[in-house]
Amino acid sequence: DILVINPLYALWETDLSDHLFAAAAHTGKTELSNNVNRIRLKTDHDYYNSGVLLMNLKKGRVMIRREEIFAFVAEHGSELFLPDQDVLNALYGSEVLALDDAIWNYDARNYRNYLLRSGGVRDMKWVMQQTSILHFCGRAKPWKHGYKYRFGLLYQHYVQLTKRFLPDHKECISL
């Protein structure tokens, strides 16, 4: 549920150093949900979105233990709202290098929040020039009937381009 609209070179070149992941937190204009998730998961760091992750595979092979994940889910299963994201944050959130969500994991539902937080700087032109990854977070998706958010037309534009330039794959693409 992501749409890449600008190059990913800078993300690819990101030095993870000792971090396990690089990810973005969707803090919103009040950071309320971020703080609720900190309390809920008993963490002292931002709540990172798992939709776009840059992974340090070498470190992950050493640090990530299946048993630890299964034990956490067994103990907290009824408390997990977004299980993959909750596990990432609870067990490994302190190992995350924070990315700018407006560039690397732009929540397509929240255009007005980004505009407000930036004092009007991060407008539609800015998004089209600076954002690399649009993320269609939540249940509403631009390929589903009734999608009402701002970036639905952009998604449809890319679907049309894909159909035009990859005609042999039309059956894999929906509007």
Give the ranges of each region predicted by the language model.
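GT-A fold catalytic core of metal-dependent nucleotide-sugar glycosyltransferases
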Residues: D1-E31, V52-M55, V62-M63
